[in-house]
A protein has these predicted regions:
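Cofactor-binding loops of NAD(P)H-dependent oxidoreductases
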Residues: 46, 144-146, 179
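Glycine-rich nucleotide cofactor-binding loops and adjacent beta-alpha elements
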Residues: 1-90
């Protein structure tokens, strides 16, 4: 990981300093492009007064969570709010809804959100109820068996979270067909979309 911290170019009083800071973007993009797979490069512009507010950004870019994020420019500005964060459970107290949570990518997303402290509501079609129950039980989540393509699904989701709140939605549900577009029937295409 290459993480370059610089000053916000527009806030530099001297044109030479501003130019040098602006060049960091090109440098990190070039590094990001030339490095081999598995390596990343970012620049974080830190405005004066925000030096004590970069921890979450630095932690993210130095973690495995940023493995596919490279050659990005992030700006950190001062803020009056400094929330206390439990870095072992950064999503503690949050509620997440993951659609398509009974297996595959949805299950993995539910695992990560739960690992990070969120209560995960696992949603999938009723036909996947057994797998959905298994995932929810393993991660300490809850189940919402529902076909999100049904006309009543939006209202059922609203009703489920009414008075409870919802902080995170990961809409992962989908249907894949191992066919080329030319070989798909209109019905198969409709399911995918």
């Amino acid at each position: 990981r290459v993480l370059v911290l610089g000053r916000t170019p527009e806030l530099c009083a001297c044109p030479k300093h501003a130019t040098a800071q602006r060049a960091l973007e090109g440098l990190t993009r070039a590094i990001g492009k030339e490095f081999k797979k598995g390596m990343t490069s970012q620049v974080v512009y830190v405005a004066p007064g925000a030096e004590d507010q970069i921890e979450s950004t630095v932690r993210f870019f130095l973690s495995a969570k940023s493995a596919y994020v490279s050659a990005q420019v992030v700006r950190v500005s001062p803020s009056d709010t400094k929330p206390a964060i439990d870095w072992s459970k950064p999503l503690a107290g949050k509620t997440a809804l993951v659609t398509g949570a009974s297996r595959g990518i949805g299950e993995a997303i539910a695992d990560v959100l739960a690992r990070d402290g969120a209560h995960v509501v696992c949603l999938d079609i009723p036909a996947q109820e057994a797998d959905l129950q298994r995932v929810a039980a393993r991660i300490g989540g809850s189940v919402l068996g529902l076909d999100i393509t049904s006309a009543e699904a939006p209202q059922k989701i609203v009703d489920h979270f009414k008075g409870k709140g919802l902080d995170i939605i990961v809409h992962n549900a989908g249907v894949t067909r191992d066919k080329t577009l030319a070989n798909m029937t209109p019905q198969q295409w409709g399911l995918v979309m």
